[in-house]
Design a protein with these regions (language model features):
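Short, gly/Ser/Thr-rich active-site loops of penicillin-recognizing serine hydrolases
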Residues: 111-113, 117, 203-218
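Intrinsically disordered, low-complexity acidic/polar segments
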Residues: 183, 195-197, 214
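Beta-lactam-recognizing serine transpeptidase/beta-lactamase-like catalytic domain environment
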Residues: 1-190
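Short alpha-helix boundary/capping segments
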Residues: 124, 192-200
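Short amphipathic alpha-helical face segments that pack within enzyme cores
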Residues: 78-84, 199-206
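Residue-identity detector for glutamine
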Residues: 12, 72, 173, 199, ...
Length: 218
């Protein structure tokens, strides 16, 4: 393209745009924003701490900094952290801690524990969250197609994480729904598989349809 926009760049996975933005922002700003978004922090879910995601460009050369801007270099992300981040984008920047256990009941059916989401801290400015929501919605509308998620209004992005050593890349898809009667966040990673859309996409499609049926009582 002779020119591009953030919307088109995200939709078409135009890596060079995000690499250039990372180099323009510089190490300090990139690190600061990554930490605000939860990189380097652990999230405790039902008493179980997650392994912290990592963004470290302290020793990065200029080209390495650009590489980090597209999720490569030494970047590491925990799928649960990414899913929490998706929930934060959907919620205007504030995350809600998910839970693994829905409920625990006695042999007589009396509940002794009921799981519930706990509001957490702000990971993004509300305007940033809204902008990302619009961009991810555009990505589904113009690239993946709404027919992929019938009955749902989805914001999503795929990813293909190269891991080197002659291994196949990790295929990713992450996102959330905009449906008030079916608020879902999802993150799929298929390790050593291939491209995100080809590998994680079909799983995300089936997962959302099944989850929506449960939430909506269908």
């Amino acid at each position: 393209f002779p020119y591009t926009t953030l919307f088109r760049s995200m939709s078409q996975s135009c890596n060079i745009v995000f690499a250039e933005l990372a180099m323009e922002l510089g190490k300090d700003k990139m690190t600061e924003e990554a930490e605000k978004m939860g990189f380097g922090s652990s999230f405790t879910i039902d008493g179980v701490p997650t392994l912290a995601s990592s963004y470290d460009v302290s020793k990065a050369e200029t080209r390495d900094l650009g590489w980090s801007g597209i999720g490569q270099y030494t970047d590491l992300v925990n799928p649960m952290h990414l899913n929490i981040l998706m929930g934060a984008i959907a919620n205007g920047g504030v995350y809600v801690t998910p839970y693994y256990i829905d409920s625990i009941k006695t042999p007589f059916g009396l509940p002794t524990y009921v799981g519930y989401g706990t509001p957490g801290e702000r990971l993004l400015k509300s305007e940033t969250a809204d902008a990302l929501k619009d961009i991810m919605r555009y990505t589904v509308e113009t690239n993946y197609g709404d027919s992929m998620f019938p009955g749902l209004t989805v914001c999503a992005k795929t990813g293909t994480g190269e891991i080197g050593e002659d291994k196949n890349p990790n295929g990713w898809m992450t996102g959330f729904t905009l449906d008030s009667d079916c608020p879902l966040a999802f993150t799929i990673v298929v390790e050593n598989s291939g491209f995100g859309m080809a590998q994680a996409g079909p799983i995300a499609q089936q997962l959302l349809q099944s989850a929506a049926a449960i939430v909506r009582g269908q």
